């Protein structure tokens, strides 16, 4: 599975195709933009994603986004996980 560090994510955020898989409540606390499909809905809404796009997937701590990346990859969609998730991103200086 591909991954990107929180620092690389911060430096390249505007150029990435972000897929935020956090719950609506979690996202309301801190919205990074991008596409929002909660992990629980990912399989039923996967058709909303472009198969030719590489997505950078984020959750709160990087655990659920690993699961999402595996699901996306199994469906032929390129995905990379943000290591440590939003928690790691927010801890950066």
Model-derived segments and spans:
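Rhodanese-like catalytic fold shared by cysteine-dependent sulfurtransferases
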Residues: 1-17, 21-54, 63-93
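Short, surface-exposed ligand- or partner-binding patches at beta-edge/loop junctions that are enriched
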Residues: 58
């Amino acid at each position: 599975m591909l991954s990107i560090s929180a620092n690389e994510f911060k430096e390249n955020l505007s150029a990435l195709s972000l897929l935020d898989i956090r719950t609506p409540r979690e996202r309301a606390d801190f919205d990074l933009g991008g596409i929002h499909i909660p992990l629980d809905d990912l399989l039923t809404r996967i058709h909303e994603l472009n198969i030719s796009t590489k997505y950078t997937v984020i959750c709160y701590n990087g655990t659920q986004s690993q699961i999402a990346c595996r699901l996306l990859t199994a469906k032929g969609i390129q995905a990379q996980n943000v290591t440590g998730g939003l928690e790691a991103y927010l801890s950066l200086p």
